Amino acid sequence: MIAIKDAHFLTSSGQLSQCPASLTSEMVILGRSNVGKSSFINTLLGKNLAKSSATPGKTRLANFFSTTWEDKENALRATFNVIDLPGFGYAKVSKSLKKEWEGFLWELLSVRVSIKLFIHLVDARHLNLEIDKNAKENIQALLRPDQAYLSLFTKFDKLNKNEQHRLFLNAPKPFLINSAHFNALSSKYPTLEVVRQTLLKYLLTNPL
């Protein structure tokens, strides 16, 4: 079983010069405003670290968290950073994904060699939105051989059973599902442990 032994806030950055040194592998969490990034991060890490903005789309800083993961079964202990990006696409503050990510954020994603995994959160109730398609295309266009992209569907518990089943069968792979705090709705949907195992596997495939 994987346990998060430590998780704490490092810094908020609005410029590359403000970012912490690239000393360990990192995963980036990205998604539209109100997709549930803060809830996902807090559940994943077992600690209330990520804060939701009172005004969706207002935050423009990247938040860095240091985390230590332990897999006792495999005698493994590893430290990774989690980078929480500002939510994109809120209609009142942005006209396009390109504008959202120009400058600092795009430069951060393009040049930071320590980033090994992009986790794109998608609202399960609103699939195939143009802004999510654009986000996926932009991330995949800059992926290096030592990086991976993974979709994770939030708000899964808001779907009825037929909708859940269709999503599970038809969603493009690879993907994970974040149901209500990762409580398994049935044996075929992932628990928090499965999510952690999957992310750890990606992060360890190409360590820094």
Swiss-Prot record:
Binding site for Mg(2+): 38, 59
Residue ranges constituting the EngB-type G domain according to the UniProt record: 23-205
GO cellular component: cytosol
Record-level Gene Ontology MF annotations: GTP binding; metal ion binding
SUPFAM superfamilies assigned to the protein according to its UniProt record, in alphabetical order: P-loop containing nucleoside triphosphate hydrolases
Keywords: Cell cycle, Cell division, GTP-binding, Magnesium, Metal-binding, Nucleotide-binding, Septation
Positions bound to GTP: 31-38, 57-61, 84-87, 154-157, 182-184
InterPro entries registered for this protein in UniProt: G_ENGB_dom (IPR030393), GTP-bd (IPR006073), GTP-bd_ribosome_bio_YsxC (IPR019987), P-loop_NTPase (IPR027417)
A GO BP annotation: division septum assembly
Keyword check for Metal-binding: yes
Needed co-factor(s): Mg(2+)
Record-stated family: Belongs to the TRAFAC class TrmE-Era-EngA-EngB-Septin-like GTPase superfamily. EngB GTPase family.
PANTHER family, per the entry: ENGB-TYPE G DOMAIN-CONTAINING PROTEIN, MSS1/TRME-RELATED GTP-BINDING PROTEIN
Role noted for this protein: Necessary for normal cell division and for the maintenance of normal septation.
Name under which the protein is recorded: Probable GTP-binding protein EngB
The organism of origin for this protein: Helicobacter pylori (strain Shi470)
